[in-house]
Amino acid sequence: ETARLLQHWRNHAFSGIRPFFCQVEAVETAIWLTEVAPQLGNNGKRFLEHLDKANTEANPELSRLALKLATGAGKTTVMAMLIAWQAINAVRRPNSQKFTRGFLIVAPGLTIKDRLRVLMPNDTESYYANRELVPSDMLPDIAHARIVITNYHAFRLRERMDISKG
């Protein structure tokens, strides 16, 4: 599934905007770290241990990976490609621990949250179908993804105020 998606992103005759090279390379980096590096013995282990150490020092309960993209480079498209890669592999390889169908996307505000709705498979402007990010025969697999898009305010403690009667 991964190889097929990579071929699609590189070689498909897109009717509209094709993924930029930097978008494909960002996704390839995440794929390499997840699928290739663990199989490279000590060479891959070195990269993974470095990331594990940095994550443990920063926040031992949350593993993070950052992909650097310039302003306007299409981070939403990259998110859609990453979700597609993970969800399709999770559906087609249900016993694998490398892949997931569950995604939590935290936006910085309501405007961005609304723009990210294109990451929902059932949205009328879904990037998976409208931007042809997923081969048509794989689109039903994306429907199995569980995606929650919220904004960071949802995690703030709610304040209660007592208003005295009077």
What name fits each language-model region?
Residues 1-166:
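RecA-like P-loop NTPase motor core of helicase/translocase proteins
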